[in-house]
């Protein structure tokens, strides 16, 4: 690979900087093994940016992201900044504006039960034994969260509140294509989630997804009502590959997928726009209670890097190398404290070193 790539690195707050350090160790191993020309630039975001620049998303950070091929994001927030007005707090003042600025309309949340971690899965042992590897593809900018009209009116017994579920054809088409393209990189199956037996928006959703499916004859398509999907995820999550969801349904199902893995420290997330530009981050929070103690699990941040390589840099071999290295570490019983259950645990730094070494060795 001879192309030059540039990544904007935004470590953020809490455990963000220390887990980001581990991801950059792994990136260095990827650079060397695959002869990739990747440079990075660091920028403040969230609480760190408030402390250093007086605002959670400084113009220099936005400009740096604009000049990059992708953004590797840590985590933001913490008690230190909770006294600020909501729009000036790290989460709402940084992450949401970044998503809006770069028109990040799709969210990809993988949820995988790794071999050796079945005991952390809250499902029955016989179900957990089958394992699962699911990718939830959620539409981020349409649906009931943004549809108009919305509001409250009236008083007394006549007081009411209302929201409107609205989806346009182009919004459904583009998120469906993201799901089908993702399935092509995985096990070639898409399950589209809707409520087409009740909602007009879901009827349109199903019609358009069926149309897009004709462009992907190599991908199997199934439809499932949201209420059934929530049950099937508990009954047999191994049946799913890619879940295609509207904003509301994806909000619900992606969290359910996360919970059945048993550890938020293992879950990455990607938010993409139509040009393939993406923001990649762990699904968990900044965990200020363990920040600076060298005990945080860096795997979600490292897996976020793998998603970045796969979806924004089209470097699937490098992404797969990271995933294999993580699998090897877990198979060998290497655990940070959140997964140790009383057994010997490695530190944040040690886990990063081990995964980077395994990438370099090509395990």
From Swiss-Prot:
Keyword Ribonucleoprotein included in the entry's annotation: no
Where does this one sit in the cell? Answer: Cytoplasm
The gene name reads leuB
Residues that hold Mg(2+) according to the record? 227, 251, 255
Ligand binding (NAD(+)): 78-91, 285-297
Designated name of the protein: 3-isopropylmalate dehydrogenase
Job description of the protein: Catalyzes the oxidation of 3-carboxy-2-hydroxy-4-methylpentanoate (3-isopropylmalate) to 3-carboxy-4-methyl-2-oxopentanoate. The product decarboxylates to 4-methyl-2 oxopentanoate.
Q: How does it assemble?
A: Homodimer.
Which EC number(s) does the record attach to this protein? Answer: 1.1.1.85
Keywords linked to the UniProt accession: Amino-acid biosynthesis, Branched-chain amino acid biosynthesis, Cytoplasm, Leucine biosynthesis, Magnesium, Manganese, Metal-binding, NAD, Oxidoreductase
What Gene Ontology molecular-function terms does this entry list? 3-isopropylmalate dehydrogenase activity; magnesium ion binding; NAD binding
Please write the reaction equations for the catalytic activity of this protein. (2R,3S)-3-isopropylmalate + NAD(+) = 4-methyl-2-oxopentanoate + CO2 + NADH
Family, similarity comment: Belongs to the isocitrate and isopropylmalate dehydrogenases family. LeuB type 1 subfamily.
Q: Which Pfam families match?
A: Iso_dh
User: Where is the site described as Important for catalysis found in this chain?
Assistant: 145, 195
Required co-factor(s) are:
Mg(2+); Mn(2+)
Co-factor binding details: Binds 1 Mg(2+) or Mn(2+) ion per subunit.
> Which SMART domains is this protein grouped with?
Iso_dh
Task: Output the Gene Ontology cellular-component terms.
Answer: cytosol
Q: Name one GO biological process term.
A: L-leucine biosynthetic process
User: What species was this sequence derived from?
Assistant: Shigella flexneri
- Write out the pathway annotation from the protein's UniProt entry: Amino-acid biosynthesis; L-leucine biosynthesis; L-leucine from 3-methyl-2-oxobutanoate: step 3/4
> So where does substrate get bound?
99, 109, 138, 227
């Amino acid at each position: 690979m001879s192309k030059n790539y540039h990544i904007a690195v935004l470590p953020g707050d809490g455990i963000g900087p220390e887990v980001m350090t581990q991801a950059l160790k792994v990136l260095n191993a990827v650079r060397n093994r695959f002869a990739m020309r990747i440079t990075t630039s660091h920028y403040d975001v969230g609480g760190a940016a408030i402390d250093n620049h007086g605002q959670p998303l400084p113009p220099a950070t936005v400009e740096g992201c604009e000049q990059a091929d992708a953004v590797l994001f840590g985590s933001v927030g913490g008690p230190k900044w909770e006294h600020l007005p909501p729009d000036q707090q790290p989460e709402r003042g940084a992450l949401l504006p970044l998503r809006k600025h770069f028109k990040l309309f799709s969210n990809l949340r993988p949820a995988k039960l790794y071999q050796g971690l079945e005991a952390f899965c809250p499902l029955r042992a016989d179900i957990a034994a089958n394992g699962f590897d699911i990718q939830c593809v959620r539409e981020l900018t349409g649906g009931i969260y943004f549809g108009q009209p919305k509001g409250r009116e009236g008083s007394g017994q006549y007081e009411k509140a209302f929201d409107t579920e609205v989806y346009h054809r182009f919004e459904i088409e583009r998120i469906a294509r993201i799901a089908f393209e993702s399935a092509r990189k995985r096990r070639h199956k898409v399950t589209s989630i809707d409520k087409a037996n009740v909602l007009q928006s879901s009827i349109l959703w199903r019609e358009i997804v069926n149309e897009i499916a004709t462009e992907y004859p190599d991908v199997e398509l199934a439809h499932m009502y949201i209420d059934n999907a929530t049950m099937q995820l508990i009954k047999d999550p191994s049946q799913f590959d890619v879940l295609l969801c509207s904003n509301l349904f994806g909000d619900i199902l992606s969290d359910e997928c996360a919970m059945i893995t048993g550890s938020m420290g293992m879950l990455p997330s990607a938010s993409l726009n139509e040009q393939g530009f993406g923001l990649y981050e762990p699904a968990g929070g900044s965990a200020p209670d363990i920040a600076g103690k060298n005990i945080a699990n860096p795997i979600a941040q490292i897996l976020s890097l793998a998603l970045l390589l796969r979806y924004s840099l089209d470097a699937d071999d490098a992404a797969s190398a990271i995933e294999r290295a993580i699998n090897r570490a877990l198979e060998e019983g290497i655990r940070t404290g959140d997964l140790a259950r009383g057994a010997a645990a490695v530190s944040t730094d040690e886990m990063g070193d081990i995964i980077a070494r395994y990438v370099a060795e090509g395990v």
